[in-house]
Amino acid sequence: MEKSVCIRTDDFFHYLKKGAIPPHFPESNAQNGVVIEAFSEAAKRFSRGGYDVYVDGIVGPWFLEPWLGAARKGYEVHYMVLRASREITLRRAVERSKLDLKTNTELVEIMWEQFCDLGKYEANVIDTTAQTVSETVQSIKAHLKSGQNRIK
């Protein structure tokens, strides 16, 4: 990898100003779709520029259409979900949250439920419950090398 870029999806949500709806509210679905399309387009542009692109953020299967479209157009797209047990997920999230404890706990529990059974994408899950950050990085590299999480 000679050139790479990491796109943090949260950054794109922070670009929203006037009229922004918190992304966890049900009425934010259309806004969230626009944001996902925006960072998908940014990823494709960097890829065309010769960069390996890593998208770091919460992207559920319900928002994969832009990525499936990119894969159909020949972009190499890998979809991996890093998931720990509920208990570990809550502990990790609370340690790094900018929200109050109650709100953060509620949001993480909702998201964990959304990601605890991904149906046909369950094979794309990397269980990070017992992994260190370094071990998780190695798991991601192994999955990329094998191509097992490449979507077409």
Give residue spans per PLM region:
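Hydrophobic "lid"/C-terminal helical patch
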Residues: 43, 140, 144
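Amphipathic alpha-helical transducer elements in NTP-driven molecular machines
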Residues: 32-40, 83, 109-112, 137
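Glycine-rich phosphate-binding loop used to anchor ATP phosphates in small-molecule kinases
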Residues: 30-78
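Conserved nucleotide-binding/hydrolysis micro-motifs of P-loop NTPases
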Residues: 11-13, 83-88, 131-132
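Conserved substrate/cofactor phosphate-moiety recognition/catalytic segment
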Residues: 1-44
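Small-molecule kinase domains that catalyze NTP-dependent phosphoryl transfer to phosphate-bearing small molecules
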Residues: 95-139, 148-152
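Conserved phosphate-donor/acceptor-positioning beta-strand/loop module used by diverse small-molecule
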Residues: 73-93, 126
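Short, hydrophobic alpha-helical segments
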Residues: 47, 144-149
